[in-house]
Amino acid sequence: MFRTPLTRALGGLALAALLAVCGPAQAQSKKDTLVLAMQLEPTPGLDPTAGAASAIAEVSLYNIFETLTKIGSDSRITGLLAESWTVSPDLKVYTFKLRPGVRFHNGEAFSSAHVKFSFERAVAKESVNKDKAVFANIERIDTPDAQTVVLNLKNGNPDLPFQLGQGTAIIVEPKSAATNGTQPVGTGPYRLEAWNKGSSVVLSRWDGHRNAKDVKLRRVTIRFISDAAAQVAALLSGDVDAFPRVAAGRSLAQFQNNKKFQVITGASRAKTILVMNNKRKPLDDVRVRRAIHAAIDRQAVIEGAADGFGVPIGSFYAPGAPGYVDLTGVNPFDQAKARALLHQAGITPPLELTMKLPPVSYARQGGEVIAAQLAKVGIVAKIENVEWAQWMSGVYGQKAYDLTIVSHVEPLDFGNFARPNYYWGYESKAFNELWDRVRATIKPEERNRLMADAQKMVAEEAVSVYLYAPTSITVAKAGVKGLWKDMPLSANDLSSLSWGN
């Protein structure tokens, strides 16, 4: 019908009345909770400075705790607790201007004193911070005022802004630091509401955060699901809304062909490797380690462990990282060569070794593939499946193993080869000298050349079997927004997530 001024006015009033009635109800019904899943539960706690497991930072980094800088999915570094920073030409002096108006969950005001405390704590004698070497390079910390902190380094470090955005560089509050594992107190947008051991962690939005109004999710439940089939089932049933780093490669088609879901694939800086205990005989013999290398078909492992979602690597470095070189030809798949190397090393088959595998699917599935390949050259790998806490204490802590499979997700962890007490037991004076040169070099071209030399050295010495760089796979409901595509580090930035229309 035609609308007269009166009917238009009445229609406008009716519409206004309808909006007045429906608007609040619609706002109240807008989803502000989410269930996210991870493969592993954090151990031993939620303090990423107190344990090596990447699952710790996946729960707490950028959520409970914050850092001076923040690393995005595109690897771009921005300020978080630091508003800005400057650096001297020799990269030895970093001056950070801190963000004002920041408070910890316990009400304490954040200042430069907390940065000084946190970084000195990281390098203290009793510290177990896995990036202790980063902080040991700090010669002096100056705090000229509450909003300024100056880091004076022993050696120039071009990677420092990135390193200060990782979980090992969280800023903590002195009174609560000792109990951060179970009662974490940070400056982040979320607080720990509950931890149901063996099942889930619940985080709730902290209204005292400076950007609380921009945080869309009021509560996030993080479930722990290590079994690949159970991961798929939880997504299909709707029990889980988003699963970053999911082990669902074989089942991706059913998600890709379902409009209820989104599948996001991207790059990662992770390295999945077969670790060999270099301190144990006969693995202390490079010929035996090279034989194990030669016995393994990387592509078959990628198919069996990662459902084809990975790129072969020949050293402890992921494609796309600065200075990366392709070294997959250094220790190629060659079973005849593997047998010959074992013979040269005086090994009479069968050589029996234990392979302790954590509960993640890539390790369990990859272990079966590798054990079958090793058997063809006279090596019997006896598989022992262990839980994650057992792996952390027995394999990583006590070094009680011959072989194991794990994915190292930290992007800047090559320096672990210079740690003689690290769990793979590698010691090399030549590598240590080379790594000192890498750390002291600030020119990108020269640094990349030295990084290439470092990659070649650990490849030729076959410290571990470098298998593949895994593809990052996220499966989520179609309405979840803000998920990362690429994974330059293991983190779940919950403040960026929301529900779309």
PLM segments and residue spans:
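Surface-exposed binding/hinge segments that line
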Residues: S29, K97, D131-P174, A194
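Detector for C-terminal structural segments
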Residues: S29-D32, N196, A295-G323, Y362-A371, ...
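N-terminal lobe/hinge region of extracytoplasmic solute-binding protein
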Residues: A37-P89, E120, V185-G186
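Gly/Pro-rich hinge or "lid" segments in bacterial periplasmic/extracellular proteins
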Residues: R76, F162-T221, D227-A229, Q335-A336, ...
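Aromatic- and charge-enriched surface segment that lines or borders ligand/interaction sites
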Residues: E83-V128, P144, V150, A234, ...
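Ligand-site clamp/hinge motif
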Residues: A178, G208-A253, A371, V380-K382
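Append "and occasionally in soluble cytosolic enzymes with long acidic Gly/Pro-rich linkers
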Residues: V202-R205, N257, L283-A372, D453, ...
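A bilobed periplasmic-binding-protein/Venus flytrap-type ligand-binding module shared by bacterial periplasmic
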Residues: S204-G208, G266-A291, A418-N421, D436-R439, ...
